[in-house]
Design a protein with these regions (language model features):
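Short amphipathic alpha-helices and their capping/turn segments at secondary-structure boundaries
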Residues: 39-45, 67-74, 179-190
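Boundary/entry segment of secreted carbohydrate-active catalytic domains
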Residues: 11-38, 43, 49, 55-58, ...
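Active-site acidic/histidine proton-transfer and metal-coordination neighborhood
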Residues: 5, 11, 39, 58, ...
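A structural motif
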Residues: 49, 106-109, 191
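Glycine-rich, proline-tolerant flexible connector loops at the mouths of alpha/beta enzymes
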Residues: 53-76
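Acidic/histidine-rich catalytic cores of soluble enzymes
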Residues: 22, 51, 130-219
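Aromatic- and glycine-enriched glycan-recognition loops and surfaces
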Residues: 36-38, 63-69, 220
Length: 220
């Protein structure tokens, strides 16, 4: 999936769909984080956006099931779909993670975006990926993130189920000093989601600093 700060692109699952349409375009609702759920629906409908990558503020995977069902019904009525979710909270508590996957299955979500605070959490997530057949994609948040360096991410995914891949944030990977296009190719088909944004990169106090910019105006 791709996001315009965040536009979002998701890679289709089948070879046939990849040939027909390499990516599907949508919007990451973090972009609309100052709006409530109903306003997000109105915005998407007004601008002809069908695909949403939803954040927990707009649909909480741990909310009461009746609330979740009601919000899904609103999306369905308005021709919208939550086809990805995240960045999702994860835990060493397997039951906590299971609820996230149960939510994703109910919503029809194909990819869950994650950024676990502990590498050991992947043991739980991998079991759920295999049980539910739902992909997860590891997000990067610059060099301050555990996953800011692509080498770390590659080391994780090469030893895990192929349904564990990457959410490549183009702005943040650029801010970390990497060539986004080169990194994309190096992941060799394991990029399942893209956050499309732009940043200019400056050196401040001997550190790389990424500053948000309009797409096409930055260094990404």
């Amino acid at each position: 999936a791709i996001h315009y700060d965040d536009v979002l692109l998701e890679r289709p699952r089948s070879a046939a769909s990849v040939h027909a349409a390499p990516f599907q375009l949508g919007i990451q609702t973090w972009t609309l984080r100052n709006l409530d759920f109903d306003a997000v629906v109105s915005f998407a409908k007004k601008h002809g956006i069908r695909n949403l990558q939803v954040i927990g503020k707009h649909i909480d995977p741990h909310a009461d099931w009746e609330e979740i069902k009601a919000k899904k019904a609103i999306l369905d009525t308005n021709g919208l779909r939550a086809y990805t979710f995240g960045v999702a909270g994860t835990s060493m508590d397997h039951a906590f993670n299971r609820r996230l996957f149960e939510f994703a299955k109910f919503m029809g979500i194909k990819v869950i975006i994650v950024e676990p605070r502990d590498f050991a959490i992947f043991d739980s997530l991998e079991k759920l990926v295999q049980e539910f057949d739902i992909r997860i994609a590891i997000h990067n948040h610059g060099l301050t993130s555990l996953y800011g360096n692509p080498i770390v991410v590659r080391n994780i995914i090469q030893h895990r189920d192929e349904r564990i891949g990457v959410c490549l944030d183009v702005g943040w990977i650029t801010a970390a000093g990497f060539d986004a296009a080169k990194i994309y190719r190096n992941y060799k088909g394991r990029v399942y989601d893209i956050h499309l944004k732009d940043k200019t990169v400056e050196v401040t106090n001997q550190k790389l600093v990424g500053i948000s910019a309009h797409i096409g105006k930055g260094d990404a």
